[in-house]
Amino acid sequence: MGRSPCCEKAHTNKGAWTKEEDERLVAYIKAHGEGCWRSLPKAAGLLRCGKSCRLRWINYLRPDLKRGNFTEEEDELIIKLHSLLGNKWSLIAGRLPGRTDNEIKNYWNTHIRRKLINRGIDPTSHRPIQESSASQDSKPTQLEPVTSNTINISFTSAPKVETFHESISFPGKSEKISMLTFKEEKDECPVQEKFPDLNLELRISLPDDVDRLQGHGKSTTPRCFKCSLGMINGMECRCGRMRCDVVGGSSKGSDMSNGFDFLGLAKKETTSLLGFRSLEMK
């Protein structure tokens, strides 16, 4: 709840104070002092509110108030205090005994302000008018900072691709195979960063038969599948490498340089070999 009003506004007088009301207020304060302004009007027999009685006493009926116009000394003191304190009229009135804050404010707006303008002084800043106007013009206009969100996008350079043409020729054949290889160069490889010892280069090597054909100029005749397994019995192999005769449990070969080793069961010390028919599974 807010503060209750100081008096009943329906039964109070408004407007200018009469001489009789002034005499009653002065007589009561001289006899009893100021006291509480809320209860003073009823005790003094006045149909006024407490605020009205207080302002009437402070601004007009106090015995220490100065009557009459302001002197030149008071004018200069008000100008000096205003340059230091600004529009704080209650503080200025405290330095001028016998003058009220309301009286000083009215006197400033009606007389002293006009006096300063005639002297060429700005009443607000207390500086020469030309200097104050020049300082206001020289002040740069403060622009509101514009916030911009910048997004930096960096594109990695495209990997360089190098092409190499290679041709492979096989002896005994007139055909040539041309191979086109691509090589990519990347600036950064995340796999190499994690595993520096890992080699990811891919190479294409020639077949074993081609290496044997090209190696040291030697010509060798490959063996057929049956001959390599030793499954020829008393027959001439088509490759012409060897002839195998199986007699009983032993096998004799006409050419043992290549070895008749079926499933790795040949004896290296002797020339007698085990036949694959006489093996028993254990």
UniProtKB/Swiss-Prot annotation:
<dbReference type="InterPro" id="IPR017930">
    <property type="entry name" value="Myb_dom"/>
</dbReference>
<feature type="DNA-binding region" description="H-T-H motif">
    <location>
        <begin position="89"/>
        <end position="112"/>
    </location>
</feature>
<keyword id="KW-0677">Repeat</keyword>
<feature type="domain" description="HTH myb-type 2">
    <location>
        <begin position="62"/>
        <end position="116"/>
    </location>
</feature>
<keyword id="KW-0678">Repressor</keyword>
<dbReference type="Pfam" id="PF00249">
    <property type="entry name" value="Myb_DNA-binding"/>
</dbReference>
<feature type="region of interest" description="Disordered">
    <location>
        <begin position="119"/>
        <end position="145"/>
    </location>
</feature>
<feature type="compositionally biased region" description="Polar residues">
    <location>
        <begin position="130"/>
        <end position="145"/>
    </location>
</feature>
<dbReference type="GO" id="GO:0005634">
    <property type="term" value="C:nucleus"/>
</dbReference>
<dbReference type="GO" id="GO:1903086">
    <property type="term" value="P:negative regulation of sinapate ester biosynthetic process"/>
</dbReference>
<keyword id="KW-0238">DNA-binding</keyword>
<keyword id="KW-0539">Nucleus</keyword>
<dbReference type="GO" id="GO:0010224">
    <property type="term" value="P:response to UV-B"/>
</dbReference>
<dbReference type="GO" id="GO:0000976">
    <property type="term" value="F:transcription cis-regulatory region binding"/>
</dbReference>
<dbReference type="InterPro" id="IPR001005">
    <property type="entry name" value="SANT/Myb"/>
</dbReference>
<dbReference type="GO" id="GO:0003677">
    <property type="term" value="F:DNA binding"/>
</dbReference>
<dbReference type="GO" id="GO:0003700">
    <property type="term" value="F:DNA-binding transcription factor activity"/>
</dbReference>
<feature type="domain" description="HTH myb-type 1">
    <location>
        <begin position="9"/>
        <end position="61"/>
    </location>
</feature>
<keyword id="KW-0804">Transcription</keyword>
<dbReference type="GO" id="GO:2000762">
    <property type="term" value="P:regulation of phenylpropanoid metabolic process"/>
</dbReference>
<comment type="function">
    <text>Transcription repressor involved in regulation of protection against UV. Mediates transcriptional repression of CYP73A5, the gene encoding trans-cinnamate 4-monooxygenase, thereby regulating the accumulation of the UV-protectant compound sinapoylmalate.</text>
</comment>
<dbReference type="InterPro" id="IPR009057">
    <property type="entry name" value="Homeodomain-like_sf"/>
</dbReference>
<protein>
    <recommendedName>
        <fullName>Transcription repressor MYB4</fullName>
    </recommendedName>
</protein>
<comment type="subunit">
    <text>Interacts with BHLH12/MYC1 and BHLH42/TT8. Interacts with SAD2.</text>
</comment>
<dbReference type="InterPro" id="IPR015495">
    <property type="entry name" value="Myb_TF_plants"/>
</dbReference>
<feature type="DNA-binding region" description="H-T-H motif">
    <location>
        <begin position="37"/>
        <end position="61"/>
    </location>
</feature>
<keyword id="KW-0805">Transcription regulation</keyword>
<dbReference type="GO" id="GO:0045892">
    <property type="term" value="P:negative regulation of DNA-templated transcription"/>
</dbReference>
